[in-house]
Design a protein with these regions (language model features):
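Hydrophobic alpha-helical and helix-loop surface patches within well-folded domains
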Residues: 1-149, 153-155
Length: 156
C-alpha cells in the first residue's frame, strides 16, 4: 500500500497525480472510514501488553486509517515540510526505538505547525467527526454554524 507517491519520483503529470489520489481514496480512505465507524473499531495507537498481541492490532484500522491520517498530515503541513521533517526524524532516530511523539516533534519543527496537538486526536481516538453546517442570512450577512459529533455507522 502506498500512502504517498514516491516523493523523489513524483508523478509525471497532474493527471497521474490525480489518478494516484483517486486510487488512494477508493482503495484506502473509504475502507478506513467504513471500519472506523463501527462500534468495534479501535484507535491507531494501542498499548501492547504482551508481544503475542502485536499481530492482533495490525488490521485495516492500523493500515488504512494510518495511511489516511498520514496523507491528511502531509496535506496539512505541505510537501516540503513533510520531507524535511521525515528526513530529520529518520536521521535523528536511525537504529533506535521511538515514540509517536518523536515523529510529531520532527514534523512540528519542520513545519512550524502544532502537529502533535492536531495528530494525537486522530491517532489516540477511534472514529471520526461528522460535521454539520447550517447556513442562514441575517441582516444581509451569511452566518455559518458548525457542529460536530462522532460518526457511527449504526446512526447512534
Amino acid at each position: 500500500m502506498r500512502v504517498l507517491p514516491n516523493l523523489s519520483i513524483m508523478p509525471s503529470s497532474d493527471y497521474d497525480f490525480l489518478k494516484f489520489q483517486t486510487q488512494f481514496v477508493s482503495d484506502t480512505l473509504i475502507s478506513a472510514l467504513e471500519f472506523d465507524a463501527l462500534k468495534n473499531s479501535h484507535p491507531i495507537e494501542i498499548e501492547v501488553g504482551h508481544p503475542s498481541e502485536v499481530e492482533e492490532i495490525f488490521d485495516s484500522i492500523s493500515y488504512n486509517k494510518g495511511a489516511s491520517v498520514i496523507r491528511m498530515l502531509h496535506n496539512y503541513i505541505g510537501n516540503d515540510a513533510f520531507k524535511q521533517g521525515m528526513k530529520h526524524y529518520l536521521t535523528k532516530h536511525s537504529y533506535k526505538n521511538t515514540q509517536t511523539e518523536d515523529l510529531w516533534a520532527s514534523l512540528e519543527t519542520a513545519s512550524g505547525k502544532p502537529v502533535g496537538k492536531v495528530m494525537t486526536t486522530w491517532t489516540s481516538q477511534m472514529g471520526f467527526p461528522l460535521i454539520h453546517v447550517e447556513s442562514r442570512v441575517e441582516a444581509g450577512k451569511k452566518i455559518l454554524t458548525l457542529t460536530q459529533e462522532k460518526f457511527n455507522a449504526d446512526g447512534r
